[in-house]
């Protein structure tokens, strides 16, 4: 039962509360709430349709069926309100009380509540220390249990123990042996033998438990237990016991209340019975379930009265227990109660659970009145903040406002006649409607609302017709198009709502996208095409003369005149005198070379933005809009956007761009390219047939050849189409402007479709790339086989899209749930921690520059330019665009900034750590719900992510393997940790071969000494440079075999095989096609064998041994003499399957749920030197010894490739075997900061591959929520339990509270203190000085030991289920489990998050709903001064 704190006795006591507590209901509390007992199972009389008296719908208990009318009809009308009828006993009141009056059923025997013995963890079982099976035997009346042994002995003459189980036979035998008078003793007499069965027995046992004593006992055994299992068992029980003890601090919460004597009956309106036509009834399942309980209860009552035999009673009691079980939770039972049609009945628990349950259906998803919906059409003449609203819709939506005006003007007298006038659509109505609409915006919403821009406010314009008109620029935000999309219109009613809609939600204020701060109202499709066409330059040629080329004009007006007179073409190159910025940043007149179209465009550009002299593509436009918004203000930008839209449409129409098949140009070189590629493939096959390469290598090389041929062809095609008609080829213009189409699509139209992936059969096989590509393109047309291969990709695409939407939606929901309570609560948390941000590089390419990553953040420390020593930004200052420019110009590579990850605010987060609000470009304000914005920003693009691998219509991506490092700058080389041996490459030239595994190469700028870039040089590569050498740009540093990993001999000597037995540890594979033999290491059946190559020196001494991984190909024979640098073994790299990388959504889910990957790498936890141990159970042991003699051992599966060799030096956090590193390992070894950076970068990587930009902040907010718990390692003297998960802030507060306290070890002669008590030093001093005076033994105390804990990373689902708020957790998942744990622990919900407040019907504590605004009075300055003056007078 829910309890409201501070019940004020005003009209509606529920409105004023700020906490909600939950607990077990005692029988007394149920009776107190109840209005009467339900005695009969009848519902309503089938003839009169009136409720039966004392039945489930009884009017006496639940209230009248008709307003102010008693059952017998003696009292009618409101004047008798509150009278109780003397004939039928019904109170005369309104009928809605039937929604909240509760009844009850008195049970003849106590019944166990199914939630507490059937859900895990089993609460009753844990408290009594009984396993679930045994508990069921008691509850369902199969065994007796000894509650008190008394003087009883069992058949063998031994004393009985508490909780011994007895069959009926044994029970009766024991009763026979006892003296007669034992039965008449009182139950509490220690000599009496008490044994019972059923829930009654459990109730007795629970009532006899002393929770405190049990808690001490379990704590003791948890601390001193040796066996792991018994210890975890004790800790689990302790958790339940502790939650009961904690709950008693707030209100009484007794374990025996888990057993019910009284069952509440919910109000009849919540389980309605509706008459259908034909005399049948539709009823809620609950009525059936209640009826069964009542029937069985009444039958049991009668059987007990007539003293029926025990067997019959027991059966009846068991049936009663089962019927109450199914009433509370029908789905938990094996034998659920079903209807005739075999559908399980919906019990009380089911009405809370799931999407259709109380929480998600009614409390979180309420319906609104005053809304309309219709199809949308484009409204190109609208302003950005306007929308077209059909007249009929507006008259209906604004009806109350219109009625009021009609009555005010005296046109009508009553509301009814006003409605008539409106329905007749008289002219005066439209007149009034025009007035009412002014300054009263509407909200437009398009489902699915994936982010906050899915609902925006517009000023309506009345239009004829039935469709809503939408401004084309806001389509991106709504993700709307005009192919039949519908939108809903809502009307904000109150003045506050109207104000918020106008100030915060108006479309012209939402120009920036909150996910990344880039403009979102960007022209698309035809607008872009028009703007691109008008600003593109075309030069005269002999066959196509451009009018007016190279003329010079005085002003834009002149250009306009020339254009209108037909003397100048739109695309002509001209000169013009116009204002632009000079180098000093001042606006001055200059002569600018430009085109006629650009002059026209610059007429609408605000002066502050200067002269824009570029071809306008979509990307350019986005930057221009962002720039204009930052140098001007919102109204100016909105006006510019509207003008730009008009211009775009106008010139798209003028240009009349369309394309025919002739515009799709196929390069002439295509046939030659394909022939060349075929020749190369032939060559590869020949190599394979001669046995020079393996099948795997052949496959990889073939795929490579086709991939590069395809890339070359695409380049040629693009070049062709780019140079066609000076780039005025319509297809190219559409592509280049960003209006429609992509490089991929052009490639498939003009080049070749390329490589395709095989269908994926089961999870195991398939998904590889088919090595014969599709050579045709869509213009030439595909052959039947090619078409067939294509269809698979196309269909998979469609199926994927459908599945993806649901997945993405679920991801969004989990994100919202985990981060909904992150609100900006304070200005500055004063933390000294932050994160170091550097530019993100991938393969030395800068993916995201330092500036992009720190823009809008707050600097943690002063950032000082190392060249000039000037302070570029002070600590605590926001890094603006201007500061970013200066930082990028300096040689700084890393900046420490504040971050949500390190924010130390106890509630929510602080504004400084969050930084700039991306939707406004200013610092975040307090009350901003940044958690929800983060969830929306990450979830919204989820639908654009691919489901599995990166394909375009099934075309395999995949880049040719890299096989060398080439310098991209000139500079000096610094090489660390380099070991090489002289060897020969495949052509027989002498080369240096690298044999060290952690070789790092730095390229340093000679002048400044700044490191330009760093590379890792792979093991086994041939290196062509020396340390300290100066190289130019484009120097080849090293080369390696991209298809095989190798093991290279470091010494000259003679080879010997060890444990290499044919058929045991290696197989001889004979290639069918070539007849060549290869020795391949296989997993030995005899696990003792360790396949190893030994190298012996001249003297026959062992120089080096090499362990061989499974799947390695031997390149040397036993006894062969070798030179240093000889390749001993080739390990084929796994073929680059398309399905190799978990991409897209599944990868993001994997990261956010903190799941461990399927084949995790084994990671070293310390720095040290590697040596190999034995093989244990199919695992190879790797031993790492640190400098300080610390030794760690790791087991690596034999099937996975080991990345280290004997005597290699490894650092902590380095993988020892192949596979992905698990986030848990990173957290354990490198700490929380590293794992946070890792998660942010990995998730960003997935989005980046799809071309989606999301600011790091959003991920940081979510990851902060995943790291809010710590796991207690050692509880010390706190009340925590070992391995308990605790909120970081609770942990810190608890430790701070204990800090400096003392623990009594020996109380001496003190009467006040007990051993184990925690006291302050002051209390200890006072007590001891008292004892000293009387010469008694002093109290001995020690310092408190505080708890220690380690941070844990939780997946988003677990993190949201473990929030402090049980209401929020219950509405997310596993509703019954959450509620039942909360009830046992007597939890109190402080209503701090957004979700809890929505559920209890309060305003959310964010934005204008922040709690402190409730106590703020708004007044004028004069009022304030007057009030202050009065206050001062009052003081003196």
Curated annotation (Swiss-Prot):
Cofactor note (record): Binds 1 Mg(2+) ion per subunit.
Record-linked InterPro entries: DNA-dir_RpoC_beta_prime, DNA-dir_RpoC_beta_prime_bact, RNA_pol_asu, RNA_pol_N, RNA_pol_Rpb1_1, RNA_pol_Rpb1_3, RNA_pol_Rpb1_3_sf, RNA_pol_Rpb1_4
GO aspect biological process, one term: DNA-templated transcription
Catalytic activity: RNA(n) + a ribonucleoside 5'-triphosphate = RNA(n+1) + diphosphate
Top-level taxonomic group: Bacteria
Entry keyword set: DNA-directed RNA polymerase, Magnesium, Metal-binding, Nucleotidyltransferase, Transcription, Transferase, Zinc
A Pfam family: RNA_pol_Rpb1_3
Cofactor(s) the protein requires to work: Mg(2+); Zn(2+)
One GO cellular component, as annotated: DNA-directed RNA polymerase complex
The enzyme's E.C. designation: 2.7.7.6
Amino acids binding Zn(2+) 2: 829, 903, 910, 913
Binding site for Zn(2+) 1: 70, 72, 85, 88
Any GO molecular function: DNA binding
Top-level enzyme category: transferase
Residues annotated as binding Mg(2+): 481, 483, 485
Similarity section: Belongs to the RNA polymerase beta' chain family.
Subunit and interaction comment: The RNAP catalytic core consists of 2 alpha, 1 beta, 1 beta' and 1 omega subunit. When a sigma factor is associated with the core the holoenzyme is formed, which can initiate transcription.
Function: DNA-dependent RNA polymerase catalyzes the transcription of DNA into RNA using the four ribonucleoside triphosphates as substrates.
Protein name, UniProt field: DNA-directed RNA polymerase subunit beta'
Species for this entry: Flavobacterium johnsoniae (strain ATCC 17061 / DSM 2064 / JCM 8514 / BCRC 14874 / CCUG 350202 / NBRC 14942 / NCIMB 11054 / UW101)
């Amino acid at each position: 039962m829910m309890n409201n704190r501070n019940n004020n006795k005003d009209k509606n006591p529920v409105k004023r509360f700020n906490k909600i507590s939950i607990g077990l209901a005692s029988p007394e509390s149920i009776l107190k709430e109840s209005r009467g007992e339900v005695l009969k199972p009848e519902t309503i009389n089938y003839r009169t349709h009136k409720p039966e008296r004392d039945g489930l719908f009884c009017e006496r208990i639940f209230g009248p069926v008709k307003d102010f009318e008693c059952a017998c009809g003696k009292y009618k009308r409101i004047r008798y309100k509150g009278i109780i009828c003397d004939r039928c006993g019904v109170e005369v009141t309104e009928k809605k009380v039937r929604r909240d009056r509760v009844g009850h059923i008195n049970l003849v025997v106590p019944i166990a509540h199914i939630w507490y013995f059937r859900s895990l963890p089993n609460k009753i079982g844990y408290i009594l220390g009984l396993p679930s099976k045994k508990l069921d035997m008691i509850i369902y009346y199969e065994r007796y249990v000894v509650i008190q042994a008394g003087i009883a002995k069992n058949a063998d003459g031994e004393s009985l123990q508490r909780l011994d189980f007895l069959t009926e036979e044994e029970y009766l035998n024991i009763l026979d042996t006892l003296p007669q008078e034992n039965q008449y003793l009182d139950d509490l007499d220690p000599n009496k033998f008490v044994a019972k069965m059923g829930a009654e027995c459990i109730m007795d046992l629970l009532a006899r438990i002393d929770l405190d004593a049990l808690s001490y006992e379990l704590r003791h055994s948890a601390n001193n237990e040796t066996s792991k299992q018994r210890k975890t068992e004790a800790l689990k029980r302790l958790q339940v016991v502790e939650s009961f003890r904690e709950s008693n601090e707030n209100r009484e919460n007794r374990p025996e209340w888990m057993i019910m004597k009284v069952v509440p009956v919910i109000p009849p309106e919540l389980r309605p019975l509706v008459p259908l036509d034909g005399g049948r009834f539709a009823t809620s399942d609950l009525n059936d379930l209640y009826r069964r309980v009542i029937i069985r209860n009444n039958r049991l009552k009668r059987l007990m009265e007539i003293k029926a035999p025990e067997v019959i009673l027991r059966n009846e009691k068991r049936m009663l227990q089962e019927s109450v079980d199914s009433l509370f939770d029908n789905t938990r039972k094996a034998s659920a109660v079903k209807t005739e049609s075999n559908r399980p009945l919906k019990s009380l628990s089911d009405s809370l659970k799931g999407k259709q349950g109380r929480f998600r259906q009614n409390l979180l998803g309420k319906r609104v009145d005053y809304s309309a919906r219709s199809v949308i059409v484009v409204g190109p003449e609208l302003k950005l903040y306007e929308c077209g609203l059909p007249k009929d819709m507006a008259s209906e939506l604004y009806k109350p406002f219109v009625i009021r005006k009609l009555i005010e003007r005296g046109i009508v007298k009553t509301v009814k006649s006003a409605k008539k006038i409106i329905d007749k659509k008289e002219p005066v109505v439209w007149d009034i409607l025009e007035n009412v609409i002014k300054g009263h915006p509407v909200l437009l919403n398009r489902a699915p609302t994936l982010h906050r821009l899915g609902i925006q406010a517009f000023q309506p314009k009345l239009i004829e017709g039935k469709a809503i008109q939408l401004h084309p620029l806001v389509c991106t935000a709504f993700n709307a198009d005009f192919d039949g999309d519908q939108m809903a219109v809502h009307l904000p009613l109150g003045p506050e709502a109207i104000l918020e809609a106008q100030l915060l939600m108006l479309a012209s204020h939402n120009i920036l996208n909150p996910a990344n701060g880039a403009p979102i109202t960007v022209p698309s499709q035809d607008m872009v095409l028009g703007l691109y066409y008008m600003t593109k330059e075309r030069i005269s040629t002999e066959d196509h003369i451009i009018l007016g080329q190279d003329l010079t004009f005085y002003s834009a007006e002149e250009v306009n005149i020339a254009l209108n007179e037909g003397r100048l073409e739109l695309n002509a190159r001209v000169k013009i005198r116009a204002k632009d910025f000079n180098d000093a940043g001042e606006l001055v007149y200059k002569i600018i070379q430009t085109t006629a179209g650009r002059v026209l465009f610059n007429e609408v550009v605000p002066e502050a933005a200067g002269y824009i002299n570029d071809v306008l593509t979509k990307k350019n436009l986005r930057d221009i809009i962002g720039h204009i918004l930052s140098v001007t203000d919102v109204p100016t930008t909105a006006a510019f956007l509207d003008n730009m839209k008009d211009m775009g449409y106008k010139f798209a129409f003028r240009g009349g761009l369309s394309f025919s098949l002739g515009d799709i140009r196929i390069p002439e070189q295509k046939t030659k390219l394909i022939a060349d590629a075929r020749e190369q493939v032939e060559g590869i096959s020949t190599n394979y047939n001669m046995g020079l390469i393996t099948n795997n290598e052949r496959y990889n090389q073939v795929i490579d050849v086709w991939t590069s041929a395809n890339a070359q062809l695409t380049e040629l095609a693009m070049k062709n189409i780019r140079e066609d008609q000076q780039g005025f080829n319509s297809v190219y213009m559409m592509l280049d402007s960003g209006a429609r189409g992509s490089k991929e699509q052009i490639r498939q139209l003009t080049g070749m479709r390329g490589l395709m992936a095989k269908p994926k059969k089961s999870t195991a096989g398939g998904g590889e790339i088919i090595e014969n590509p599709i050579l045709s393109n869509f213009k030439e047309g595909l052959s039947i086989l090619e078409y067939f291969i294509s269809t698979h990709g196309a269909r998979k695409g469609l199926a994927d899209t459908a599945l993806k939407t649901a997945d993405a939606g679920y991801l969004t929901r989990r994100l919202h749930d985990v981060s909904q309570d992150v609100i900006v609560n304070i200005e500055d948390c004063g933390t000294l921690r932050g994160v170091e941000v550097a530019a993100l590089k991938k393969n030395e390419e800068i993916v995201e520059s330092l500036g992009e990553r720190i823009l809008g953040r707050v600097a943690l420390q002063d950032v000082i330019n190392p060249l000039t020593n000037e302070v570029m930004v002070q600590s605590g200052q926001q890094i603006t665009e201007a500061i970013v420019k200066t930082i990028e110009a300096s040689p700084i590579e890393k900046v420490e900034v504040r971050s949500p990850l390190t924010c130390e605010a106890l509630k929510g987060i602080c504004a400084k750590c969050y930084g700039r609000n991306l939707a406004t470009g200013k610092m975040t304000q307090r009350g901003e719900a940044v958690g929800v914005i983060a969830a929306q920003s990450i979830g919204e693009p989820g639908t654009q992510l691919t489901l599995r691998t990166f394909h375009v219509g099934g075309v395999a991506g995949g880049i040719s393997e890299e096989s060398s490092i080439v310098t991209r700058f000139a500079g000096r080389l610094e090489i660390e940790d380099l070991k090489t041996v002289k060897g020969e490459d495949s052509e027989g030239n002498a080369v240096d071969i690298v044999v060290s595994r952690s070789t790092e190469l730095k390229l340093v700028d000679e002048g400044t000494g700044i490191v330009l870039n760093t590379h890792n040089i792979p093991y086994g590569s041939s290196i062509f440079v020396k340390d300290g050498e100066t190289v130019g740009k484009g120097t080849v540093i090293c080369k390696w075999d991209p298809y095989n990993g190798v093991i290279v001999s470091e010494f000259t000597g003679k080879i010997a095989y060890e444990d290499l037995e044919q058929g045991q540890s290696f197989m001889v594979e004979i290639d069918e096609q070539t007849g060549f033999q290869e020795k391949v290491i296989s997993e030995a059946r005899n696990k003792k064998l360790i396949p190893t190559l030994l190298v012996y020196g001249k003297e026959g001494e062992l120089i080096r041994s090499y362990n061989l991984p499974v799947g390695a190909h031997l390149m040397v024979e036993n006894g062969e003499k070798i030179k240093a640098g000889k390749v001993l073994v080739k390990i084929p790299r796994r073929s680059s399957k398309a399905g190799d990388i978990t991409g897209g959504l599944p990868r993001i889910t994997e990261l956010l749920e903190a799941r461990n990957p399927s084949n995790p790498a084994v990671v070293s936890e310390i720095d040290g030197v590697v040596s190999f141990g034995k093989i244990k159970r199919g695992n190879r042991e790797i031993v790492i010894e640190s400098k300080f003699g610390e030794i760690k051992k790791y087991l690596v599966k034999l099937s996975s490739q080991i990345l280290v060799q004997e005597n290699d030096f490894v650092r902590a956090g380095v993988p020892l075997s192949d596979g992905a590193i698990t986030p848990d390992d990173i957290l354990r070894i490198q700490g929380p900061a590293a794992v946070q950076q890792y998660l942010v970068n990995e998730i960003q990587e997935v989005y980046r591959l799809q071309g989606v930009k999301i600011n790091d902040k959003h991920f940081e907010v979510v990851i902060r929520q995943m790291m809010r718990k710590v796991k207690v390692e050692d509880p010390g003297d706190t009340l925590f339990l070992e391995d308990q998960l605790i909120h970081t802030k609770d942990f810190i507060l608890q430790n701070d509270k204990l800090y400096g306290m003392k623990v009594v070890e020996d109380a001496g002669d003190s009467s006040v203190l007990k051993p184990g008590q925690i006291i302050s030093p002051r209390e200890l001093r006072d007590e001891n000085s008292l004892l000293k005076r009387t010469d008694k033994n002093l109290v001995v105390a020690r310092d408190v030991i505080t708890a220690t804990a380690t941070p844990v990373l939780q997946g988003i689902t677990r993190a949201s289920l473990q929030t402090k708020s049980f209401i929020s957790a219950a509405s997310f998942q596993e509703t019954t489990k959450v509620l039942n744990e909360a009830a046992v622990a007597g939890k109190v919900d402080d209503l701090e998050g957004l979700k809890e407040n929505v559920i209890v019907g309060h305003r959310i504590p964010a934005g204008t709903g922040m709690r402190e605004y409730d106590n703020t009075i708004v007044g004028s300055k004069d009022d304030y001064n007057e009030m202050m003056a009065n206050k001062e007078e009052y003081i003196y």
